[in-house]
Amino acid sequence: MAWQFNSHEAVFVQIATRLRGEIVRGTYAPGAQFPSVRQLALEAAVNPNTMQKALCCLEEEGLLYTKGTIGRFVTSDTAVLDAARERVRRDSVRSWLRQAEELGISKQELIQYIQKEDETV
């Protein structure tokens, strides 16, 4: 699936957000080798420098680490993965709340919508 980017946020931030989500969802297993910068840049159709910047962000967060010249790997540290999972969840909820506010939906109405949709899922 083609990667899509918006103009409201730096592309490397959007890439880091997407990859962070994929890591915490288990798309990339703890301890597994991560795809190369070049491979990911081709997949996302971005400059390798942009991808490198995004991956450096994930390294700073401790989600990825580099093993010499072998490449990057996903952390096996459950505390780091749990903290990242919580961050992804929190950011998602904040995004929903901002969108609801922009649409004039109160928090109570949002809760009602969620409960109603939950019944249909």
Task: State what each model feature region is.
Residues 42, 77-78, 119-120:
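Short Asp/Glu-rich motifs
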Residues 66, 85-88:
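Short amphipathic alpha-helical interaction segments
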Residues 33-65:
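N-terminal helix-turn-helix
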